[in-house]
Each structure stands twice: as C-alpha cells, then as structure tokens.
C-alpha cells in the first residue's frame, strides 16, 4: 500500500513538474515549439473561418467585393466587439510566441498583430457577402484593439487595462432569431442586446508601492438594448412593439 502511494505521489509530482516545465516560456527561440505554434495557430484560424462561414455567411449569396458604412448601426456594439476580439486574439498569440522563446520584438510584430490579421480576413468575407460588406469602421476598431495591446507593452511592459466581455440571453433574440441567433452559442455572437464590453483597470499596477491587492480592478462597461435591427429607422414594431433602443454605461 505504501509503495503504491509513494509511486502515485511520485508520478503526480513528476507529471506536474513536466507540465510546468512544458508551459514555462523558453529562454531563447525553441524552434520545435515555434513550429508547433505556427501550425496550431494556422489550423485553428482556418477552422474558425470555416465555422464562421457556416454560422454567418452560408445562408446568403456571394457578391462582388464592396464596402458599406455601418458606423451608425447597433449603437456601435459591433465596433466594441471588434476592439475586444482584436485585443484578445493578439494577446493570446503574443503569449504563445513568448512561450516559443521569440524575441520581444518578434512577439509584438508577429504575435500582437495576429488579431488584426485574422479579423481582416473576416472583413474580406464580409466584403464578398451580399448581406454585409467590408467596413472601414470595423478595420479601425480592429486596429484600435491591436494598438491598445501593443501600446501597453511598449509603455509599461505589461497589460494594465484589459478589455473584458460578459453576456446574458435576452427576449430580443426570439423576436428575430434569424438575425440575433436561435441558440445560445449563436446569440452570444449575434445578439448585441445581451453583450457588455468592459475596460478593466488593474489598480495595483498603476500604484506599485501601494497596499492595493493585485486582484482589485476598476471596470467601466458599455452595453445597449432594444435593438431588433441595426438601424432604428428599420425597426418593424411587429417584432417587439415595446422596443426602445438605448445605451447603458
């Protein structure tokens, strides 16, 4: 019994140490890790674009590439989503390349800009869809998310201001499930009424010598409700007569 306990404990500690060693960022460029990271990130990107095509574009015909001006739609909730997505994708990719042991310069150059590059591909898909179109506002929001990450790395060497996201289901989705989503996994992307985007400020990081705990953050949120369509003038009161579009801070 003792031998089994000792062997089990030793195996657990060894496995834990192996995992910790594997997860620890390399001190210098680890080519095998880099190759794995590039292949994995490429495969995930292609898979995500294929899935997005099925979820978002498959039901609508293709068109010639075109631009639209959607800056006034959805009370800019879609633009907040672009900022968040670009930031988080860039953050994930930068940390992945840090794990590979890439230089700080290359981490920022190839990692942090991944979010912008991926979302530019999505924008191209928008541009060829008859239902949507490429948006300069979306591209600007994507660039803003990337800039938020890169600027903090260059200025402070850490992320003190982090975009965050929360979601709850709403009654609006059932009014237009084709636009706002049929299921929870569709609504979390499509139903802007249930989304909230936050800018979370880590208090301790701004006052290093204070007794403020590291976990304490001050967050400012933005959301909107009452949206059945992108533009207020397109709302058909048959969908939801009591619908009143409004912002929430």
Located regions from the model:
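Residues that define the transmembrane beta-barrel architecture of outer-membrane proteins
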Residues: 191-197, 214, 245-249
């Amino acid at each position: 019994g003792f031998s089994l306990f000792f062997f089990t404990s030793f195996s657990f500690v060894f496995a834990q140490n192996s995992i910790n060693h594997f997860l620890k960022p390399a001190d210098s460029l680890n080519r095998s890790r880099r190759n794995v990271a590039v292949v994995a990130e490429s495969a995930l990107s292609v898979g995500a674009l294929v899935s997005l095509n099925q979820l978002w574009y498959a039901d609508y015909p293709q068109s010639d590439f075109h631009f639209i001006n959607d800056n006034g739609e959805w009370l800019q909730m879609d633009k907040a989503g672009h900022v968040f997505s670009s930031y988080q994708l860039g953050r994930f990719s930068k940390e992945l390349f840090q794990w590979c042991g890439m230089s700080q310069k290359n981490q920022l150059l190839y990692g942090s800009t991944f979010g912008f590059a991926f979302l530019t591909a999505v924008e191209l898909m928008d541009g060829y869809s008859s239902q949507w179109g490429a948006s300069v506002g979306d591209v600007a929001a994507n660039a803003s998310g990337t800039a938020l990450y890169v600027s903090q790395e260059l200025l402070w060497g850490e992320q003190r201001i982090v975009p965050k996201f929360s979601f709850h289901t709403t009654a609006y989705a059932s009014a237009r499930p084709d636009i706002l989503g049929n299921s929870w996994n569709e609504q979390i992307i499509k139903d802007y009424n249930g989304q909230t985007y936050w800018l979370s400020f880590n208090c301790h990081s701004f006052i290093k010598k204070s007794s403020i705990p590291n976990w304490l953050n001050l967050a400012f949120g933005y959301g909107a409700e009452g949206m059945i369509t992108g533009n207020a003038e397109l709302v058909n009161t048959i969908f939801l007569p009591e619908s009143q579009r409004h912002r929430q801070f």
